[in-house]
């Protein structure tokens, strides 16, 4: 009898255990419940961890892409400028010899220029405001003879930083960023339409139109003959 009661207690005593196993059974039930709760919490924790890792990976990818774009933008900003003559687009110099720019005189100052810039040896005094005492030599483009600006040969003490610098008028200069061109060679199967191809296409369309008109006339003649034969019969 005792063995049977003991067996009943092991298999699931509720509240009427007569042999002192009531507390043990309750402890077992609480333990199972806590284990179940811990398992649920563990699963939830794993789920959150997975979501966090996914979010972190997405953020890492986004940060990597952002860094790449910032590097590309920085590289674009560091690309040198080539200054071209606005008349014939010959290169006059580049930003590697850049010194400064002056908004009041609307010009840029370079340490050196290309061989496309000729210097007139005839010297003259500057007539610009605040440049009294400056001796200038005129700059011209060797290609189109456009007046590009001046080179300062003699300056007062307060303008010593301009001496032997080439002052190019902004209106006479255009700029080009090295590496900014994205033009690619077009393959034969993707060749763009030009004037000759357009003429050929228009010619082919005209021939097709003439053929269609001739077929329409023949069809009209056949229909007329059939209609006449029907009326006669």
Curated annotation (Swiss-Prot):
Zn(2+) binds at residues 85, 88, 141, 144. There is a cross-link at residue 162 (Glycyl lysine isopeptide (Lys-Gly) (interchain with G-Cter in SUMO2)). The modification Phosphoserine is found at residues 36, 39-40, 233. Its main location: nucleus. GO terms for biological process: cell division; CENP-A containing chromatin assembly; chromosome segregation. Keywords: Cell cycle, Cell division, Centromere, Chromosome, Isopeptide bond, Metal-binding, Mitosis, Nucleus, Phosphoprotein, Ubl conjugation, Zinc. Residues 80-178 form the Mis18 domain. It is found in: Nucleus; Chromosome; Chromosome, Centromere. Signal peptide: none annotated. Transmembrane segments: none annotated. InterPro entries: Mis18 (IPR034752), Yippee/Mis18/Cereblon (IPR004910). Pfam families: Yippee-Mis18 (PF03226). GO terms for cellular component: chromatin; chromosome, centromeric region; nucleus. GO terms for molecular function: metal ion binding. The keyword Metal-binding applies. Homodimer, and heterodimer with OIP5/MIS18B. Identified in a complex containing MIS18A, OIP5/MIS18B, MIS18BP1, RBBP7 and RBBP4. Required for recruitment of CENPA to centromeres and normal chromosome segregation during mitosis. Belongs to the mis18 family. This is Protein Mis18-alpha. It comes from Plecturocebus moloch. The gene is MIS18A.
């Amino acid at each position: 009898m005792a063995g049977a009661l003991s067996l009943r207690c092991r298999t699931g005593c509720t509240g009427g255990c007569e042999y002192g196993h009531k507390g043990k059974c309750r402890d077992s039930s609480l333990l199972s419940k806590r284990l179940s709760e811990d398992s649920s919490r563990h699963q939830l924790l794993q789920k959150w961890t997975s979501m966090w890792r996914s979010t972190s990976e997405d953020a890492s990818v986004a940060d990597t892409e952002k860094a790449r774009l910032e590097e590309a933008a920085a590289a674009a900003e560091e690309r040198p400028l080539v200054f071209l003559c606005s008349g014939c687009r010959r290169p006059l110099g580049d930003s590697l010899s850049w010194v400064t720019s002056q908004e009041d005189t609307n010009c840029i100052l370079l340490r050196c220029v290309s061989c496309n810039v000729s210097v007139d040896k005839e010297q003259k005094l500057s007539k610009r405001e605040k440049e009294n005492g400056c001796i200038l030599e005129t700059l011209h483009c060797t290609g189109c003879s456009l007046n590009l600006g001046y080179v300062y040969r003699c300056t007062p003490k307060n303008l010593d930083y301009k001496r032997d610098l080439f002052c190019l008028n902004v209106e006479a200069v255009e700029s080009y960023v090295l590496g900014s061109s994205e033009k690619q060679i077009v393959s034969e199967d993707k060749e763009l339409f030009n004037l000759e191809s357009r003429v050929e296409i228009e010619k082919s369309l005209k021939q097709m139109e003439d053929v269609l008109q001739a077929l329409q006339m023949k069809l009209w003649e056949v229909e007329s003959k059939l209609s006449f034969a029907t009326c006669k019969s």
